[in-house]
From Swiss-Prot:
Region annotation Catalytic: where it falls in the sequence: 441-788
Organism (species): Rattus norvegicus (Rat)
Protein name: Phospholipase D2
Domain PLD phosphodiesterase as annotated: residue spans: 437-464, 751-778
Top EC class, one word: hydrolase
Catalytic activity reported: a 1,2-diacyl-sn-glycero-3-phosphocholine + H2O = a 1,2-diacyl-sn-glycero-3-phosphate + choline + H(+); 1,2-dihexadecanoyl-sn-glycero-3-phosphocholine + H2O = 1,2-dihexadecanoyl-sn-glycero-3-phosphate + choline + H(+)
């Protein structure tokens, strides 16, 4: 039996196949051998969105769009229309595939819109539009495929043939760019400018919806009412991707909200949960978003599709992971460590140079005029100049700065913001928070193209650059005086000095000693603020790390969460000039645009401390990882940290890092295990103050809580260890600092090396690197915001542990080896074996080196802090005696030859007879204790 068109469309509604004949469209032709993926839209297209009706280029030129009607659904609408037929249309565009569901009347509406478009274009003044519309005019002269005026949607007869007719109709239209890119067609196909960007993942779900205002779960955005007067409905274009959704204003194309999926994600459909007919409710930790669809069928379909999309590559963010982190462990991640700022800054400079799309930076302090490679002979490696050059190339630079309380801190983030924002429109800087707060954004992060991420303890700021030499002086070319190469007070302080013959490593404000004097006048960057002819600088020791791939995506997602959160809650950033940021999909994370050489593969997990004030959610995974790593350690712990304030009393100090260390040592003692704990701390807190008179109130406050953790009071580590094992605690734990020496003005000088690292190494297999100090501020989550990564080695190499052959992780072993080599001065100790950190011989060598160095420094410089000064009276008497370095410089120099490395014992008895906590009458004494802990 032959099926005719009359059989298919009994009311004369058949498709006229002769009208479907079209000339080929040369615009939609791929070159032979060309990959369609190469024609897809670049990621930077997200920053240049056009109004939806402005006919933006949605589809990739030359890449065909293929439609296939794969099935039908028949349902009862509940109205007088009766049974309706729904056509499922599967579309393919390059590697993108998606499905849309349409009624026959939707095809008819599309047909009418295209006919009107064709007629309008044919009536245009040809001369006026000759230049801009000649391709469109030629296409308008082509015939549009015909579509019946109506049809018997209730008939099920010959359904497959009817599907084929509609399929042919769409495919003929989609071969013509004139119709394919028209807004009526893109709305029909549910596509937009964000549909075909490979780094955003799959096509996802899109379409016109109405969304309800409100629903934010952040301070200042909660409406107390539930009546309709408390909210409004707005028409928006919704885009759902695999780990987030957004909606845009159709009239401008601007993204007006981004909602990241997280463990609070849930989709509900129906009036009971949405208070709206045909409503869809999408919950996350930050917002409850309510959408209104055109029918219950659409609401149910959208709810199902959104749920399925979230279960794709972005499903990792729908639950908490190990240590209650938002990000899971990422195996096979390429990571590289950096000890000191020189290597870290140089790698950051190389990464910035290779940026093609985005640069994200967040710092506690950022100095725009910092030089990333030194000594500088031009401005090529100056941070602000580099960012300007990349912005001019089209790279989008987004910077988040901590907005300090100006009376308490002199980092002048306002100057940093103004300086950077004036460089180029593609550089955007936001500061947070506005309200006076006790807490800070303390994290340090730089992400390039959401593919390579740097983090650790290093701000891109003054005083941080250093190398293994830990120089105390910087006088430039010895044949020239120091002030010949630095701006004088009468010159322009903002002007860059002539660098063509520069020999300085630290220019202007970069030459610093934060205990001698805190930074001032940061708007005069190249003007010295301490006398480098008489005052040594304070060396800065720090640790950083770079990660690639999915772990970098996780760090970028954290930055995006904070950026979008800040944009949402601060009115001044709601303008389009500060765009919402979008996370790239994990599905493309392995396509690395470049790598930082020298890395090793390991399993990497991103950790953080955040609160609702800082990022809109609460997390303390850094603390959890510290506690777990200490608890599960088998052989040793190596800790470098700027602060060590722990041992919970349930009131003043809450974190239990110190308690876990005590428990682990007691366990080793009970079981007769060989277990070592190495702790390195700065000999003095990094606050301005005269230590010869006891230091300022800030120094004393930090010393009080540090000694309370280490050795003073019933909660301290050593008090509890001594109670259990007496002096045997010395077999398990070493507490040290770092010091170095040099020469200035013909006299020997010495200064402590300021340890700013935030590092934990356990068993040569596990490493934690980040911005978090060991104190409540950094670890509780409810206070400062912090970032860290947990690295577990997967690539092993032979080593030793307590004299026994041991498989050590390459990342952890190489990092510890580097740290120990510099600390112990291995360059002057050729037979030094650093492989076994646990055996008695090495531990004894470590302790003896620290003791010998400390003794020599004290004899020569009478340096502070010292165990010889247990009271303020003893301190005054101690500093009144001239040092050997002053009395006999030549003899002092000969004695200094016996110094090995930089290791010295931490003076546990310094001012032990004094109360170091600021008294209530002092200005610092009025500050809540939580600020110091």
């Amino acid at each position: 039996m032959t099926v005719t068109q009359t059989d298919l469309f009994p009311y004369g509604d058949y498709l006229n196949s002769s009208q479907l004949h079209m000339e080929p469209d040369v615009v939609d032709t791929l070159k032979e051998g060309e990959d369609p993926a190469d024609r897809m839209h670049p990621f930077l297209a997200i920053y240049d969105l056009q109004p939806l009706r402005a006919h933006p280029l949605v589809f990739a030129p030359g890449v065909p769009v293929i439609a296939q009607v794969v099935g039908t659904e028949r349902y009862t609408s509940g109205s007088k229309v009766g049974t309706c037929t729904l056509y499922s249309v599967r579309l393919t565009h390059g590697d993108f595939t998606w499905t849309t569901k349409k009624k026959f009347r939707h095809f008819q509406e599309l047909h009418r819109d295209l006919q009107r478009h064709k007629v309008l274009m044919s009536l245009l003044n040809l001369a006026r539009f000759a230049a801009a519309h000649s391709p469109a005019r030629e296409a308008a002269n082509e015939n549009i495929p015909s579509l019946p005026r109506g049809g018997s949607e209730g008939s099920a007869r010959h359904t497959a043939s009817k599907q084929k007719y509609l399929e042919n109709y769409l495919n003929r239209l989609l071969t013509m760019s004139f119709y394919r890119n028209y807004h009526a067609m893109t709305e029909f196909l549910e596509v937009s400018q964000l549909s075909f960007i490979p780094d955003l993942g799959s096509k996802g779900l899109e379409g016109v919806i109405r969304k309800r205002s409100g629903g934010h779960r952040v301070p200042g955005f909660t409406c107390c009412g539930r009546d309709q007067v408390c909210y409004r409905w707005s028409k928006r274009w919704l885009v759902v991707k695999d780990s987030f959704l957004l909606y845009m204003r159709p009239e401008t194309g601007a993204i007006s909200f981004v909602q990241l999926f997280d463990p609070g994600f849930e989709v509900q459909v129906g009036k009971r949960s949405t208070e709206a007919r045909y409503g869809v409710r999408i919950d996350t930790s930050h917002r409850s978003l309510i959408l209104k669809c055109s029918s219950y069928r659409q609401a149910r379909w959208w709810g199902q599709e959104i749920t399925e999309l979230a279960q794709g590559p972005g499903r990792d963010f729908l639950q908490l992971h190990q240590h209650d982190s938002y990000a899971p462990p990422r195996p096979g991640t390429l990571a590289r460590w950096f000890v000191n700022g020189a290597g870290y800054f140089a790698a950051v400079a190389d990464a910035i140079l290779r940026a093609r799309e985005e640069i994200f930076i967040t710092d506690w302090w950022l100095s725009p005029e910092i030089y990333l490679k030194r000594p500088a002979h031009s401005d090529d490696w100056r941070l602000d100049i580099m960012l300007k050059r990349k912005a001019e190339e089209g790279v989008r630079v987004s910077i988040l700065l901590f907005k300090e309380v100006e009376l308490a801190l002199g980092i002048n983030s306002g100057y940093s913001k103004r300086t950077l924002m004036l460089l180029h429109p593609n550089i955007k800087v936001m500061r947070h928070p506005d309200l006076v707060t006790l807490w800070a954004h303390h994290e340090k992060l730089l992400v390039v193209d959401q593919a390579v991420a740097f983090l650790g303890g290093l701000d891109l700021a003054y005083g941080r650059w250093d190398d293994v030499q830990y120089r105390l002086t910087d006088l430039g070319d010895p044949s020239e005086s120091a002030d010949s190469q630095t701006p004088t007070p009468g010159s322009d302080p903002a002007a860059t000095p002539d660098l063509s013959h520069n020999h300085f490593f630290w220019l202007g404000k970069d030459y610093s000693n934060l205990i001698t004097k805190d930074w001032v006048q940061l708007d005069r960057p190249f003007e010295d603020f301490i006398d480098r002819e008489t005052t040594p600088r304070m060396p800065w020791r720090d640790v950083g790390v770079v990660v690639h791939g999915v772990a970098a995506r996780d760090l970028a997602r954290h930055f995006i969460q904070r950026w979008n959160f800040t944009k949402t809650i601060k009115a001044r950033y709601k303008i389009p000039q500060y765009p919402y940021l979008l996370p790239k999909s994990a599905s493309t994370a392995n396509h690395l645009p470049f790598i930082i050489p020298g890395g090793q593969c390991a399993t990497v997990q991103v950790l953080r401390s955040v609160d609702r004030w800082s990022a809109g959610t609460l997390e303390s995974s850094i603390l959890n990882a510290y506690l777990h790593t200490i608890r599960e350690s088998q052989h040793f712990l190596y800790i470098e940290n700027q602060f060590f304030i722990s041992c919970s009393d349930g009131r003043t100090v809450l974190n239990k890092v110190g308690d876990e260390i005590v428990d682990r040592i007691l366990k080793a003692h009970e079981q007769g295990q060989c277990f070592r704990v190495y702790v390195l701390l700065p000999l003095l807190p990094g606050f301005e103050g005269d230590i010869s008179t006891g230091g300022g109130n800030s120094i004393q406050a930090i010393l009080h809580f540090t000694y309370r953790t280490l050795c003073r009071g019933e909660y301290s580590i050593l008090h509890r260890l001594k109670a259990a094992m007496g002096t045997a605690w010395r077999d398990y734990m070493s507490i040290c600092g770092l010091r170095t020496h040099g020469e200035l003005g013909g006299h020997p000088i010495s200064e402590l090396i300021y340890i700013h690292s935030k590092l934990l190494i356990a068993d040569d297999r596990t490493v934690i690197i980040g911005s978090a100090n060991i104190n409540d501020r950094s670890l509780l989550g409810k206070r400062d915001s912090e970032l860290a990564i947990l690295i577990k080695d997967t690539e092993m190499e032979p080593s030793l542990m307590d004299g026994v052959e041991y498989q050590a992780g390459r990342f952890a072993l190489s990092l510890r080896g580097r740290c120990f080599s510099v600390i112990l001065g291995a360059n002057t100790w050729p037979d030094l074996d650093l492989r076994d950190p646990v055996c008695d011989d090495f531990f004894q060598l470590w302790q003896e080196t620290a003791e010998n160095n400390a003794t020599i420094y004290e004899q020569i410089f009478r340096c502070l802090p010292s165990n010889a000064t247990r009271s303020l009276r003893a301190l005054r008497e101690y500093v009144a005696v001239e040092s050997l370095a002053t009395v006999s410089p030549s003899l002092a120099q000969s004695e200094l030859a016996h110094i090995r490395g930089h290791l010295v014992h931490f003076p546990l008895k310094f001012l032990e007879d004094e109360s170091l906590l600021p008294h209530w009458g002092a200005k610092r004494g009025m500050i809540p204790l939580e600020v110091w802990t």
